[in-house]
Amino acid sequence: MGQTKSKIKSKYASYLSFIKILLKRGGVKVSTKNLIKLFQIIEQFCPWFPEQGTSDLKDWKRIGKELKQAGRKGNIIPLTVWNDWAIIKAALEPFQTEEDSISVSDAPGSCLIDCNENTRKKSQKETESLHCEYVAEPVMAQSTQNVDYNQLQEVIYPETLKLEGKGPELMGPSESKPRGTSPLPAGQVLVRLQPQKQVKENKTQPQVAYQYWPLAELQYRPPPESQYGYPGMPPAPQGRAPYHQPPTRRLNPMAPPSRQGSELHEIIDKSRKEGDTEAWQFPVTLEPMPPGEGAQEGEPPTVEARYKSFSIKMLKDMKEGVKQYGPNSPYMRTLLDSIAYGHRLIPYDWEILAKSSLSPSQFLQFKTWWIDGVQEQVRRNRAANPPVNIDADQLLGIGQNWSTISQQALMQNEAIEQVRAICLRAWEKIQDPGSTCPSFNTVRQGSKEPYPDFVARLQDVAQKSIADEKAGKVIVELMAYENANPECQSAIKPLKGKVPAGSDVISEYVKACDGIGGAMHKAMLMAQAITGVVLGGQVRTFGGKCYNCGQIGHLKKNCPVLNKQNITIQATTTGREPPDLCPRCKKGKHWASQCRSKFDKNGQPLSGNEQRGQPQAPQQTGAFPIQPFVPQGFQGQQPPLSQVFQGISQLPQYNNCPSPQAAVQQ
């Protein structure tokens, strides 16, 4: 039957406990063995069923339909499964709103047919499956008759029953009568519970009495905080703010339905069905109070501040995000901004949010930067004209006047905004463990790094190292050009100091560097290097210095100064035109001193036109005399070796050198 009993019990442990307590308080006892059997069948035929369970009646009706389809296909469904399914579905009916209730049962009409008549008409094989399909319906009817709906409603809606006895303004005239259970007719099945039927028939009862109330009332409520901070003392009077506040209203479950905010109610109802209604609770909400006696026209309305703590799910998401991505990752910054601007957070909320999400060292950094930001903000408040009456105790949530939650809930909107800005900036300065904040001077763009990535790194370092926002912006604009690579600098240089007023300098720089490093940009650079023409509004020239004049932009062979001098010298030295043919190469009209040919007109090599040096005499380095090789037949024609040496010794330039004979004798 799918998974074993132990796996089913561990998988749906919390949901099984909830179902058992719900049925027990409603007057129905179901054994754990039968519930495990039910969830084994659900696990087999309904794989979409969530592990955390569901309290939506539509899901349980869908389970019934799929189990009936499985029975029609020949699968055996035990009777206890049908019985437990019907009891749980009936117990979950009070959780549904009137819009979710259904007046007609989704059970097929053939449920009223006697099972014995079907077994006579069908074969033995079909009887077994039909028995599982239809016999459960009378059992469901018998099981639902013993449910004490008044007791079950008392558990689920405790505050609703209290409100019913307070006054006639919250209930209809027919609600004062006790609600009793009428016995079900024999042989018929009624899927909906009797209290839901009475609510629908009674038109005088408010339709939203059961909307958005159960989960809010089932939450744990701490004891009221006394004026002196000790539990058990008389509660302090509810604080009221005499100043004007925005028309923020608390979601009142007993308020009459209205068209305004219908989309918000739909979102809350959807999240409630998904099991995440706590995420829509605001820590501090302001509810306008009705005008009292003697109130004058035009007087700002008095509002009542109410506080609700963060949900466990929200704190868990923050903790997992910080642990997995880091406190200053883009995901965490977006999540923190949505919480900060979507809620009215007081200093106590920021402290709880930081303590539950950050490590001890990170929380110490956050607290340090928080205090530093408060001191700076207090100096600005005092220097303002007129001065702002917001002190450091209010921004930190300390002192005799701002230490309790009820006192912080009455903070002005301006103080709430200042606390939000200070805490967000303190959060941005938190460093990860083991990492150090580099200086903005060391942040340089790589040769292949995109320019937007370089600017993002530069802005991040500037935010963490520079406290003043204006100074940080100036530093970023300066370093965005100075620390960029040469290609981006050449693209930004025409825009430097020429960005029109009102435009973002960094945005213009990013636009100018768009496409640098790509294939198109590389092709443009190659074309500019080859042709030297203007492409894309830029001129690429030689960046080295000329060895002749020392200027940048050309080589020595292309130096205009040298070319001009050569032309002048040639014009002054020649003075007359060259002959028809060169006397050296015989193939050009130029002077022999200017001839650079290596071959003459017949293709014979020509000697160089440079002056030759004097030839050097041979030197004997060995101990044996040199015997020149003389072929046979020519021995008599060659002079003796002594005469050769004697002639060489008579050369004037070698008079100081020893003779070869002396060298041989030595």
Curated annotation (Swiss-Prot):
SMART domains noted in UniProt: ZnF_C2HC (SM00343)
GO BP annotations, alphabetical order: viral translational frameshifting
Gene Ontology terms: cellular component: plasma membrane
Region (Disordered) location: 164-183, 598-642
Subcellular localization, as worded in the UniProt entry: Cell membrane
Polar residues bias spans: 604-622
Recorded GO MF terms: nucleic acid binding; structural molecule activity; zinc ion binding
Lipidation (N-myristoyl glycine): 2
Keyword terms, alphabetized: Cell membrane, ERV, Lipoprotein, Membrane, Metal-binding, Myristate, Repeat, Transposable element, Zinc, Zinc-finger
Zinc fingers (CCHC-type) by residue: 544-561, 580-597
Biased segments, Low complexity type: 624-640
PTM info: Myristoylation is essential for retroviral assembly. Alteration of the glycine residue leads to a block in the budding of particles and an accumulation of Gag inside the cell. Specific enzymatic cleavages may yield mature proteins.
Recorded topology in the membrane: Lipid-anchor
Metal-binding as UniProt keyword: yes
Keyword Membrane: yes
Domain comment as written in the entry: HERV-K Gag polyprotein contains regions homologous to the matrix (MA), capsid (CA) and nucleocapsid (NC) proteins from infectious retroviruses. Evidence suggests that HERV-K(HML-2) Gag polyprotein can be cleaved into mature MA, CA and NC under certain circumstances. However, the exact boundaries as well as the size of processed Gag proteins have not been precisely determined yet.
Additional remark text: This Gag protein is encoded by a human specific provirus. Intragenic, in the sixth intron of the SCGD gene.
Protein purpose: The products of the Gag polyproteins of infectious retroviruses perform highly complex orchestrated tasks during the assembly, budding, maturation, and infection stages of the viral replication cycle. During viral assembly, the proteins form membrane associations and self-associations that ultimately result in budding of an immature virion from the infected cell. Gag precursors also function during viral assembly to selectively bind and package two plus strands of genomic RNA. Endogenous Gag proteins may have kept, lost or modified their original function during evolution.
UniProt record similarity statement: Belongs to the beta type-B retroviral Gag protein family. HERV class-II K(HML-2) gag subfamily.
Official protein name in the record: Endogenous retrovirus group K member 10 Gag polyprotein
Protein's organism: Homo sapiens (Human)
